[in-house]
Amino acid sequence: MMTRAEYIESLRRLNLKVYFMGELIENPVDHPMIRPSMNSVAKTYELAEKPEYQDLMTVYSPLIGKRINRFCHLHQSTEDLVNKVKMQRLMGQKTAACFQRCVGMDAFNAIFSTTYEMDQKLGTEYHKRFTEYMKFVQENDLTVDGAMTDPKGDRSLSPSRQEDPDMYMHVVEVREDGIVVRGAKAHQTGAVNSHEHLIMPTVAMKEEDKDYAISFAVPSDAEGVFMVYGRQSCDTRKMEENADMDLGNAQYGGHEALVVFDNVFVPNERVFMCREYEFAGMMVE
């Protein structure tokens, strides 16, 4: 497992494209607006190192045969679910902020079970692919952004009936070695602090929407991926010189970003759903 320092250094090695207030941020890790949220995620690594919290923050993984950070775990029992909630309470007590790894953890379990059902009914190999992906995540102790929410556009219309087809993430090309996708995921908690984006559908779909029924994973610095960092009223006080008041939680925080996918290639081994529209609702649930 990574230490807090190793996690921070791993973010520095990423070639992220992050825009804030109309400008490309050269160093997201040390940016005063982003650093508090990064500190929250780093706390999940820090507490996993401490002996007094290891029963909550870490767990044995049957996939790789060693202890892992619980945020990378596939739930095996009722006890796992209880300890998940206890871990979240502990993180809330330590940060008083959003620690940004909950949706990724839930996505692991939703996709793991849904891909199993898909393989059983359709004879696909999505579950095998996702199992291998989970081994990769656990071995490398990665923070993964579970990305579900699309911009949506006109919410009275289905994905395929939108005036702008990019309002929902969709497949634009299927190749022998993978797929090309385009669209965006909105309000992505902790996206800038994540090593990977794990994409899921956002609504149940009909056959006419099949190009939008996709699930896949890409590195957060994959070619064609960029993020627009969100902000709230008065939060730029953190950027003011010698600011020492009205900063809210100055040490810890959360953030959301719009993650844009501009014709991003995804290799087959990282595709976990492609046009199996009848399973989109199951994955969402």
PLM regions and their residue ranges:
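N-terminal-proximal low-complexity accessory segments that begin disordered
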Residues: 1-47
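General beta-strand structural signal in soluble alpha/beta enzymes
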Residues: 20, 146-148, 180-182
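Glycine-rich loop at the start of a catalytic domain that most often binds anionic cofactors/ligands
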Residues: 31-35, 61-71, 160-162
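Acidic, aromatic-enriched beta-alpha/helix-loop junctions
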Residues: 39-55, 211-217
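A generic secondary-structure signal for well-formed alpha-helical elements
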Residues: 45, 49, 137, 141, ...
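Internal helix-loop-helix
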Residues: 46-144
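A short, Trp-centered hydrophobic/proline-enriched beta-strand micro-motif
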Residues: 141-154
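FAD-binding core of flavoproteins
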Residues: 151-285
